[in-house]
């Protein structure tokens, strides 16, 4: 019997809350409705301050509650606007907002905020959340999890297929006999930060500002020396590495080595950041035997980024997931609806070959 699930996703970019109502029955999956709701600007600022260690334990606790309320508000609007009956929704899959992700420390952890109890109390609907904790407890990275969903969607395609998600971070999935996938590094996050700092825009529409600049190859080489790019998978990352602090440090060190770098304009740095995303993605795709690259995530709307990626990848075919009947914009929200379904039905998610965990496991905690 088919069931209805709502996936909730707010990513590294902090640019909105994506909701996806999906109908799922065994191997059948359909996106029925989807919508995006704005992310509270003050809450976004407080989250970024917390990531940059400008916070207190009290603030972190309050952010957890405020996020829960914001998710509940968005869900209530979604349900009301679409005249949905709450009793027919089997569960909500809530990723939460990642505050810090450190799976390789002595005491590995991944912290997602957004109190699931608030959602169940307000909506009267079962919520599945805390997806990453079990995988980390089993020695895994706890990320990325979308490769398992990509395999569910695209495993029947012929050829050597890869799936690329470009959000705040970028991650790839290699659909081979043994599933693999990992974060390649930054996607939109540094470009979004830089244009917001200089132009006040939340993102670089079509990559126009980056295109107006000239990439600095020497600066790009310095960026690409980041040890994360040299690390072999399994690996995952986030704002705790590729954020404001990282970029400021890189630019400061570059300025010290190149005393006369006043010629480097803000738009040139934006162009270099776009090239960083392109090169760090392309370098990984080129290592594989990929013939078809399916792209999803907000980065697909950056026209110049996609043009540069195609130039770098040459004969490899690049296609939007929309061409295969899967929403490129709501892929991650759909993934968490699917993960909620897997948890409700006590199915192991086959992700250990991606995360490096000791074994596959049932992921997520149920809040009722």
From Swiss-Prot:
Keywords: ATP-binding, Carbohydrate metabolism, Kinase, Nucleotide-binding, Transferase. Pathway: Amino-sugar metabolism; 1,6-anhydro-N-acetylmuramate degradation; Cell wall biogenesis; peptidoglycan recycling. It catalyses: 1,6-anhydro-N-acetyl-beta-muramate + ATP + H2O = N-acetyl-D-muramate 6-phosphate + ADP + H(+). CDD domains: ASKHA_NBD_ANMK. ATP binds at residues 11-18. InterPro entries: Anhydro_N_Ac-Mur_kinase, ATPase_NBD. Its EC number is 2.7.1.170. GO terms for biological process: 1,6-anhydro-N-acetyl-beta-muramic acid catabolic process; amino sugar metabolic process; peptidoglycan turnover. It holds the Pfam family AnmK. GO terms for molecular function: ATP binding; kinase activity; phosphotransferase activity, alcohol group as acceptor. Belongs to the anhydro-N-acetylmuramic acid kinase family. Catalyzes the specific phosphorylation of 1,6-anhydro-N-acetylmuramic acid (anhMurNAc) with the simultaneous cleavage of the 1,6-anhydro ring, generating MurNAc-6-P. Is required for the utilization of anhMurNAc either imported from the medium or derived from its own cell wall murein, and thus plays a role in cell wall recycling. This is Anhydro-N-acetylmuramic acid kinase. It comes from Sulfurimonas denitrificans (strain ATCC 33889 / DSM 1251).
